[in-house]
């Protein structure tokens, strides 16, 4: 949902001006980060903005063409900025895995786990895993559960991480990952 927060701020504060990182003399990832900060400030006075960002994520996952086009533009700005930093520091990667390309694998795996009883559907409709065996049971009742899919079915970071781990394993056939 974080990129959607930046996207919403872009629409509110920059789109009408035709702002781009180039126009503002900024690296792309810095510009998208600035949009996120602007969203955070805006949402403190406009609490409905959080819901708007969540609705934008639902539309993104549904494939809404307008939302996807804005996402692609901002994702490209971010990735280009990050790649610029890596190039400047001499860091290279064999392959980039984008969460947008792996989240569906993660969702599929979570749904398989739900069918097998590895995961469970919480009262609020979200899909979760009980991690008590790993983290122990503390005072916070929710600390022993990890949300894997939101109640509206949209992905969270761990959904994407699961899909990315599967993709990396498919590509590299490793037996350990650090």
Where are these regions (language model features)?
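NTP-dependent nucleotidyl-transfer catalytic core
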Residues: 1-178
């Amino acid at each position: 949902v974080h990129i959607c927060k930046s996207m919403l701020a872009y629409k509110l504060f920059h789109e009408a001006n035709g702002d781009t990182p180039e126009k503002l003399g900024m690296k792309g990832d810095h510009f998208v980060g600035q949009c996120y900060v602007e969203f955070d400030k805006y949402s403190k006075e406009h609490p409905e903005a959080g819901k708007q960002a969540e609705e934008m994520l639902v539309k993104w996952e549904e494939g809404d063409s307008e939302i996807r086009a804005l996402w692609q533009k901002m994702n490209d700005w971010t990735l280009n900025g990050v790649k610029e930093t890596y190039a400047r520091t001499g860091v290279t990667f064999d392959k980039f895995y984008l969460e947008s390309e792996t989240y569906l694998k993660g969702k599929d795996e979570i749904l398989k786990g739900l069918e097998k009883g590895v995961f469970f559907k919480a009262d609020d409709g979200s899909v979760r895993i009980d991690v008590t065996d790993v983290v122990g049971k503390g005072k916070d009742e929710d600390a022993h559960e990890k949300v894997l899919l939101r109640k509206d079915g949209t992905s969270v970071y761990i959904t994407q991480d699961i899909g990315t781990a599967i993709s990396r394993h498919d590509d590299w056939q490793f037996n350990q990952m650090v």
